[in-house]
């Protein structure tokens, strides 16, 4: 049986009302989501500045109306955290985070046994869930244990520490006095890493002198 014009108009009005309600509800959710995301980012910025950024979040419990207290529970370098919104009830939001990390990145493929230097690695700031262990000393003291592909973050586990100068080796020496620069070859009497002072044998007087390691197989003679 066909509908009368009046019934048809009534059904259309009901459908339109449901559509308007659905659109308004979706708009409310979208607006609420934007406001909540802004709140989370603002709280993170107040606590950590630009050190951390929000990757994702999930509302675990209902958000109370007119909450009066905001409590951030985040530990530095942790990929997870929580934001609590408190009134008479507590709303909890789970956070997924990324931290600003200063890392070494391979500028080109690095092969096993190759020493790190400014030609094959560079420092960059990137965001990661956890920052890898920082180098507590100059990276030129390390050589690759395995092949490290271009663009890869160079982790401490990929490397081994190795002397830049080894006892008994013939090394390059530099002596500076004002504008006078003398370069010669001499024998290392000790092992050493970058920046360390070791004993070397003078080829001129055959006396023991001291030199500071400034590169692989290179020392600067101290006065």
Swiss-Prot record:
GO terms for biological process: bacterial-type flagellum assembly; bacterial-type flagellum-dependent cell motility. InterPro entries: Flag_basal_body_FlgA_C, Flagellar_FlgA, SAF. The keyword Signal applies. It comes from the Bacteria. It is found in: Periplasm. The keyword Transferase does not apply. One of its GO terms (cellular component) is periplasmic space. Keywords: Bacterial flagellum biogenesis, Periplasm, Signal. PANTHER family: FLAGELLA BASAL BODY P-RING FORMATION PROTEIN FLGA. Belongs to the FlgA family. Involved in the assembly process of the P-ring formation. It may associate with FlgF on the rod constituting a structure essential for the P-ring assembly or may act as a modulator protein for the P-ring assembly. This is Flagella basal body P-ring formation protein FlgA. It comes from Aquifex aeolicus (strain VF5). The gene is flgA.
């Amino acid at each position: 049986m066909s509908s009368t014009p009046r019934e048809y108009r009534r059904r259309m009005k009901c459908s339109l009302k449901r559509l308007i309600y659905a659109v308004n509800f979706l708009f409310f959710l979208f607006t609420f989501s934007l406001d909540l995301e802004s709140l989370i980012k603002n709280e993170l910025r107040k606590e950590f500045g630009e050190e951390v950024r929000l990757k994702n979040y999930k509302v675990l419990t209902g958000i109370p109306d007119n909450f009066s207290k905001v409590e951030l529970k985040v530990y530095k370098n942790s990929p997870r955290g929580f934001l609590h919104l408190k009134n008479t009830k507590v709303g909890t939001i789970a956070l997924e985070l990324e931290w600003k990390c200063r890392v070494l990145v391979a500028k080109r493929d690095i092969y096993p046994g190759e020493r790190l230097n400014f030609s094959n690695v560079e420092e960059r700031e990137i965001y990661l869930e956890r920052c890898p262990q920082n180098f507590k000393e100059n990276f030129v003291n390390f050589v690759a244990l395995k092949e490290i592909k271009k663009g890869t973050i160079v982790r401490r586990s990929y490397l081994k520490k190795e002397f830049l100068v080894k006892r008994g080796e013939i090394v390059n020496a530099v002596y500076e006095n004002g504008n006078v620069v003398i370069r010669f070859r001499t024998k290392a009497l000790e092992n050493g890493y970058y920046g360390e002072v070791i004993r070397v044998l003078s080829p001129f007087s055959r006396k023991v002198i001291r030199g500071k390691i400034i590169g692989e197989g290179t020392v600067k003679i101290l006065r």
